[in-house]
Amino acid sequence: MRSFMVSRGCPYKCAYCFNHKYNMLYKGLGPLHQRMSVGRVIAELRDLKARYPTQFIKFYDDIFVLKDDEWLDEFSERYPAEVGVPFHCLMRANLLTESVLLKLKKAGLASLSMSIESGDDHVRNNVLKRNMSRKTLKDAFALCASHDIPTFSNTIYGVPGTTLDQDIGSLDLNIECGVTFGEFPLFFPYPRTELAAYAMEQGAFDGDFDSLHMSYQAGSPLKCFSKREKMRQKNLSLLSTVCLMIPALRPLVVNILIHLPLSGLYFYLYYIVKAYIIKTRIYPMKLSLKDALRSIWESFTLERFKHTEEAFKQALGGERRR
């Protein structure tokens, strides 16, 4: 799989993202969103294919399509004819129409990312600044399902001022939307973002960014949650991915499993489900046995680090000793 970007910039102001600060830096110096011509995209991707074996493209643009326009028309015609590699891209649910989805599918869309972020309307729209209704989210995911496009969603747990019940409500919205695969990271206060400032104003974070884990999946760094609450958040984060694959497990997960000190076991369940869904539905590729084993080992090692606080402490200790 190769990662690629055709544009830069995002006009939206999600509170957890750097883009609103980035846009302020370049205000008045040009359009917020800039995109390559289709011709240049095709030329670069053809060169990529000529240089390296390429089975799949992941377009990492913040939003791959902002509107149904001539660029998308040209892309949907030329990409399958001149590149012909299945791809994944990121969209906002409020921008997805049937016309846009059909053009992307014609081009070779294999799966699509659309973030939900929270099942609570107040948190999603007033705290995270997503400005999206439940109906908009449900309609967008239903549209993908109707055209057999697997979906990948992100949802944030442990936002300052929220409860475990609200996080469970976020899981429920993912299940209602029929999300194929989802990640449920815990809130992480990135420096100079609006949400980090909000966490400090709430007294939930002391502003010591250097003490944070490198990964937003290791555990909540906030002071407003007890140790037991953080354990439940982490367990729910891991098991929510499993619930999307097997929704019938939801009652067992939220009523019993998240309350048990078994995060280590739940990590393995999470990893198995993630590895299976990612490789078969989200980024489907054919790998040799050697490449498959290498991929499993590398991804497992990375996931274990991202979800383990102790690994970071050891790395940090090594840095300080040097």
Q: Model-flagged regions — what are they?
A:
Residues 28-31, 46, 194-197, 213-322:
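Radical SAM enzyme core and accessory elements
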Residues 100, 160-176:
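Catalytic cores of alpha/beta
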Residues 193-208:
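Aromatic- and acidic-residue-enriched segments that line the glycan-binding/catalytic groove
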